[in-house]
Curated annotation (Swiss-Prot):
Cofactor note: Binds 1 Mg(2+) ion per subunit.
Name this protein carries in UniProt: Succinate--CoA ligase [ADP-forming] subunit beta
EC number(s) reported in the record: 6.2.1.5
Function: Succinyl-CoA synthetase functions in the citric acid cycle (TCA), coupling the hydrolysis of succinyl-CoA to the synthesis of either ATP or GTP and thus represents the only step of substrate-level phosphorylation in the TCA. The beta subunit provides nucleotide specificity of the enzyme and binds the substrate succinate, while the binding sites for coenzyme A and phosphate are found in the alpha subunit.
Name of encoding gene: sucC
Keyword field contains Electron transport: no
Length: 388
């Protein structure tokens, strides 16, 4: 689950991080009032969406008057912002954050943290190249990224934070200020089950003080049951409608941009299925894992979910019967096809527990379902059917 910038800054401020001042506005009048309250010669109006690249997409603008703040806010709110991190439809802008002007600054830094799956530990990343996409820095000048891995048994140590401060070129009081900032960020990360933390840029102001100009936080959705206050911050308008519906039925769904719908049980098998579709010249329209304990109702809902995507021209169902029985899946497929008006080819590959019985159910259903012998055969058949 992602947080908006204003939510991230409020959370981080609670842990002692110095953040750029800002006021949330949901319409033009509120934006104008926010400009007046900030009291500076300039202000920055930022569209609040769950996506990066807002500046280049016109979602971050400097304003010099209350009238301009109102005008910019009204031009953004109610529209969809398309960035390099969104799909072609973009993300809806329901509010803007009117921020204090902090520029010019001495320099812009970067500070971020993720859960490194290879070390199974929280890893901080810092760089002197703030204000640009960290992916670009990693690709072009990886030597400018400093990493610190935190031992979960002892937590982030002050000496680790000081070492990062030295590498960033900070001096004197800035070092202690940065240690406090990084320590607070680590505590926030652990307390709230972050999956991602990023401040870009972390500005060094003209007076030498540090300030978080932006804030990005991703929460581990598996931990929301124990984070009720964080869960209340969820903005469902920023989520893919089908992905949101899938979560209600405990389905793991990710929308893609292809035309072959996929229904698979098991994340590994789902990824392998998408790979072989690509290998055979097709384009998967989604990642959909119905899970090892899939029920008939969940399979029916999964089928509906796939077919709600109007770009889908065919469906490949790939089931390995382990915990789940292939005959139960077959019955669910038949029920779904009968319930929904399916006008696209459907290829089914069943393997494992009761696979023969499942194939028999499909063959005797009288429906236009194509059986496949093996994953290779299934991919070839669905790609051929879609391209026919």
């Amino acid at each position: 689950m992602n947080l908006h910038e204003y939510q991230a800054k409020e959370l981080l401020a609670g842990y002692g991080l110095p953040v750029q001042g800002g006021i949330l506005a949901r319409n033009g009048e509120e934006a104008a009032a926010a400009y007046d309250k900030l009291g500076g010669k300039f202000a920055v109006v930022k569209a609040q969406v769950h996506a990066g690249g807002r500046g280049k997409a016109g979602g971050v603008k400097v304003v010099k008057s209350r009238e301009e703040a109102k005008e910019v806010a009204e031009s953004l709110i109610g529209t969809n912002l398309v960035t390099y991190q969104t799909d072609a439809n973009g993300q809806p802008v329901n509010s803007v954050l009117v921020c204090e002007d902090m520029y010019p600054v001495q320099t812009e830094l970067y500070l971020g943290a993720v859960v490194d799956r290879s070390t199974r530990r929280i890893t901080f990343m810092a760089s002197t190249e703030g204000g640009v996409e960290i992916e670009k820095v990693a690709a072009e000048t990886p030597e400018k990224i400093f990493k610190v891995t935190v031992d979960p048994l002892v937590g982030l140590q002050p000496c680790q934070a000081r070492e990062v401060a030295f590498q960033l070129g900070l001096k004197d009081k800035q070092i202690n200020e940065f240690v406090k900032l990084m320590t607070g960020a680590y505590k926030a990360f652990v307390d709230n089950d972050f999956a991602l933390f990023e401040v870009n840029p972390l500005a060094v102001r003209e007076n030498g003080a540090l300030a978080c100009v932006d804030g990005k936080i991703g929460i581990d959705s598996n931990a929301l049951y124990r984070l009720p206050k964080i869960a209340e911050l969820r903005d469902k308008s920023q989520e893919n409608e089908r992905e949101l519906k899938a979560s209600e039925f405990d389905l793991n769904y990710v929308a893609l941009e292809g035309n072959i719908g996929c229904m698979v049980n098991g994340a590994g098998l789902a990824m392998a299925t998408m790979d072989i579709i690509k290998l055979k010249g097709g384009q998967p329209a989604n990642f959909l894992d119905v899970g090892g304990g899939a029920t008939k109702d969940r399979v029916v809902e999964a089928f509906k979910l796939i077919l709600e995507d109007k770009s889908v021209k065919g469906v490949l169902i790939n089931i390995f019967g382990g915990i789940v029985r292939c005959d139960m899946i077959a019955e669910a497929i038949v029920a779904a096809v009968k319930e929904i008006n399916v006008n696209v080819p459907v290829v089914v590959r069943l393997e494992g527990n009761n696979a023969e019985l499942g194939a028999k159910i499909l063959n005797e259903s009288g429906l236009k379902l194509t059986s496949a012998d093996g994953l290779n055969d299934a991919a070839e058949k669905i790609v051929a059917a879609v391209n026919a």
